[in-house]
Swiss-Prot record:
Gene: darB
Keywords (A to Z) from UniProt: CBS domain
Name of the protein: Cyclic di-AMP receptor B
Purpose: Involved in the c-di-AMP-dependent regulation of the bacterial stringent response. Modulates the activities of at least two enzymes under conditions of potassium limitation. Apo-DarB regulates the activity of the GTP pyrophosphokinase RelA by interacting directly with RelA, leading to stimulation of (p)ppGpp synthesis and induction of the stringent response.
InterPro entries documented for this protein: CBS_CbpB, CBS_dom_sf, Diverse_CBS-Domain
């Protein structure tokens, strides 16, 4: 069992460690699946946030969701990519964090998710809280305790 002798990290908020919205790839609800697949492929991500024009978070879209929506009985129906919108396929029941949530809440949520979307009081997308950032900060914290 690791003993964290300092409460400094544990008192932090999600907003202090998130990747800000302007650095996060996303699509809008009205975009077609072809555009979403292009963004996912170009960035190398498997899932990205879906926002409306006011930057409100509506859900996530991922490569698997897109591919499942174009599977036909005998072939992949690529021609459907420009006919189906992101909002028809996206996952809406997603974990969310508030920008002022304690970091411990975020720690628990990234156990089962590579990232969790962060929003403010008006459900406006503020960024993502990633497992990578959590592990990086935890590593830095543990190293500082061992000095």
């Amino acid at each position: 069992m690791i003993s964290l002798q300092s409460d400094q990290l544990l008192e932090a908020t999600v907003g202090q460690f998130m990747i800000e919205a302007d650095k996060v790839a996303h699509v809008q609800v009205g975009n077609n699946l072809e555009h979403a697949l292009l963004v996912l492929t170009k960035t190398g991500y498997t899932a990205i946030p879906v926002l409306d024009p006011s930057y409100r978070l509506h859900g996530l879209i991922g490569t698997n969701m897109i591919m499942n929506s174009i599977f036909g009985l005998e072939r992949i129906e690529f021609e459907k990519l420009d006919q189906i919108t992101v909002e028809e396929v996206m996952l809406t029941d997603i974990p969310r964090l508030h920008i002022n949530d304690p970091i411990m809440k975020g720690f628990g949520m990234v156990i089962n998710n590579g990232f969790v979307c962060v929003e403010n009081d008006e459900q406006v997308f503020e960024g993502i809280f990633t497992r990578r950032v959590v592990l990086k900060e935890l590593n830095k914290h543990i190293r500082s305790l061992n000095k």
